Amino acid sequence: MTKWKRANPNGTRDYLFEECTLIEEVEQKLRLTFLERGYEEIRTPTIEFYDVFAFQNRPIDEEKMYKFFDEKGRIIVLRPDMTIPLARVIGTQRWDTPLKVTYSGNVFRANESHSGKYNEIVQSGIEVIGIDNVRAEIECVISVIQALQKLKVQSFTIEIGQVQLYKCIVKKLSIQDEEERVLRTYIESKNYAALSNFIGEKKLDRCDETVRLLEKLPRLFGNLEVIEEAEKLASSNEMKMAIARVKEMYETIEMLGYGSYISIDLGMIQHLDYYTGVIFKGYIYEIGEEIVSGGRYDELIGNFGEMLPAVGLAVQVNQIVKALQEQQEPYERNQIDIVIHYELNRLAEAERLRNLLRKDGKNAWLSLFSNLSDTFQFARKNKIGTVVEAKNEYLVEYVWNEKWVVQKEGEASCVTFKLR
């Protein structure tokens, strides 16, 4: 029964010191940026009923959920997604729209062993509810660009795609569910050879505009030239409108001065099936890992109540932390300036001194050792140059100068003066 007591479950890990501090800083800066832009916070439980995620099309694979039972035998899951619980909250209550909400929390997905993915990650995100025009998508992209700028993330890009265009192609070519799932992997992975073979095996007419658009789809990434290519092959009004929405987004964001942070990828298809229109993915060049994901999901909230249009995105906090660790100077833990050693009956004075020193910008630390020599040893080990001893009715200040020497004592001590 104790075989695994020293190990972590697959896909999880411990976070220590530097990473904990950075995770907290990233979450807080994201939160403040989103609050400044008018978003309001929502928090949902870490555990949800399985039924919350078990609606039509099953946007999240059942095998990826951590499932267990509550006291009444009902199936409970650790939330594998943040957007669906938010949709539950919005759909089951009456709201004045539009709504702009923000959140932060852990999500849990059981990825395959050795996949290199963590099963527990931290996400912070935003959602714009009740608006079906392109202003909502633009608001989300601008918000996340500004947030990443404040975090001083270097060399990032937000890719803009359009899942509606892909769905129009699939529908027009009558590609069924199983085939569609295979096709999706070819396009997302930009596997040109496999896609060409798929078209050949399906005996699709390569002269047909829609087939030509399908075959080109993985190659349609870059700037506005991509839009021009897609427009030439769009064979229905629905396709043209889907492409026009991406064009309008790109031009508006570029006009605002954020053009260097965005690009277009019409071959991008989100793995979550609830997206219905424009989608986003963000990357950092040096890492290659996804740091932002999201899009429009106009049909999701209707699973829980009133049908409301919505768009949102999530920032992968763990990946941001990884990027900051690689891009910035090595992190140094908060350096202790002074250790205060005290006799137990002088704790009140020691605590008061610590507070006074902190007000002066000094990081003062109360010693946990009862023996002064142990305090000296701790200070040397941690490169702390000053020890103050609170003893009887007076204070003694020691500094390290090849050995511990008395710097000031009694009434002459600067720290004694602060206490008076």
From Swiss-Prot:
Organism superkingdom: Bacteria
Gene3D superfamilies recorded: Bira Bifunctional Protein, Domain 2
Subcellular location: Cytoplasm
InterPro entries in UniProt: aa-tRNA-synth_II (IPR006195), aa-tRNA-synth_II/BPL/LPL (IPR045864), HisRS-like_core (IPR041715), HisRS/HisZ (IPR004516), HisZ (IPR004517)
Sample GO molecular function, one term: catalytic activity, acting on a protein
Pathway the protein acts in: Amino-acid biosynthesis; L-histidine biosynthesis; L-histidine from 5-phospho-alpha-D-ribose 1-diphosphate: step 1/9
Keyword Amino-acid biosynthesis included in the entry's annotation: yes
Keywords, alphabetical: Amino-acid biosynthesis, Cytoplasm, Histidine biosynthesis
Recorded GO CC terms: cytoplasm
Any Gene Ontology biological process: histidyl-tRNA aminoacylation
Keyword Amino-acid biosynthesis: yes
Note: This function is generally fulfilled by the C-terminal part of HisG, which is missing in some bacteria such as this one.
Family matches, as HAMAP family: HisZ
Described purpose of this protein according to its UniProt entry: Required for the first step of histidine biosynthesis. May allow the feedback regulation of ATP phosphoribosyltransferase activity by histidine.
Subunit note: Heteromultimer composed of HisG and HisZ subunits.
Family per similarity comment: Belongs to the class-II aminoacyl-tRNA synthetase family. HisZ subfamily.
Name of the protein: ATP phosphoribosyltransferase regulatory subunit
Source organism of the structure: Bacillus cereus (strain B4264)
Annotated gene: hisZ
